[in-house]
Design a protein with these regions (language model features):
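Hydrophobic-ligand binding "helix-grip"
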Residues: 99-181
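A conserved amphipathic terminal alpha-helix motif
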Residues: 194-234
């Protein structure tokens, strides 16, 4: 049973820390881990947020890619025959490698929450801020000469899961749909930290890094297409 497998790293829950505050993309827990992150604006409105949250809950944006599948073995509800993610439930990814083999990697969900309201404070500065973001790293540098706290309300749907024994990698991955109540924006963000967990993982590392370089961008594109189809009634 995947639920009973031990987590294969010492940073359990790290991807969920500070996510209700300003640290949306935490730095790597140690220098040996690599960070991947991407954030895109999907549009505006609570209706869009609901559509995107449903897509996230069923991992449709991942399963739509064709070369990777997410499987949640159990936990259906009376209102849906489809498995839904809940805390501490098992999750497996099945990925096609080079078009010739499928690799199964076990995980465990550590955070599954939907439509959670958060209230935080943000700091507004009077100086310029340099902000660079890529699919692999996010860095923010600024000089604070004067700050002013303003309320920030957000509605969040989030799924975060950790690797367990038997996975090629060690680390965590997190997906969120965020509705900013203040400006009506809907954000889709993705974050992970990882490194190889065993010899096979190190051998496969060049391919894994190549895939990680495009994985979030592909899911962002799939999310947009699925939303468009839903809005068109297809």
């Amino acid at each position: 049973m995947i639920e009973t497998r031990a987590v294969n790293h010492e940073y359990l829950g790290y991807s969920c820390q500070n996510t209700d505050n300003n640290i949306d993309f935490p730095p790597a827990p140690s220098s040996s881990y690599r960070i991947n992150c991407l954030s895109i604006t999907l549009g505006k409105g609570i209706k869009l947020y609901k559509i995107a949250s449903t897509i996230l809950q069923e991992f449709k944006m991942t399963n739509a890619l064709g070369w990777i599948e997410v499987h949640i073995p159990s936990h259906t509800t009376s209102t849906s025959s489809k498995p839904i993610p809940i805390n501490h439930s098992s999750l497996c990814t099945l990925a096609n490698v080079f078009g010739i083999a499928w690799v199964l990697n076990p995980c465990r969900i550590i955070s599954a929450r939907f439509d959670t309201t958060t209230n935080t404070s943000t700091s507004t500065t009077t100086t310029t801020t340099a902000h660079t973001t890529s699919t692999t790293t996010s860095h923010i540098k600024s000089k604070h000469t004067a700050t002013e706290s303003t309320p920030k309300q957000r509605l969040i749907s989030q799924i975060s899961f950790t690797t367990v024994k038997g996975h090629l990698l060690t680390g965590e991955e997190r997906f969120r749909i965020i509705y900013d109540i203040n400006n009506d924006n809907v954000i889709f963000d993705m974050y992970s930290f990882s490194k190889p967990s065993n010899v096979l993982g190190w051998i496969a590392l060049p391919y894994v890094r190549y895939v990680q370089g495009t994985f979030f961008r592909e899911q962002a594109g799939a999310m947009r297409r699925l939303i468009e189809r839903k809005e068109e009634g297809l």
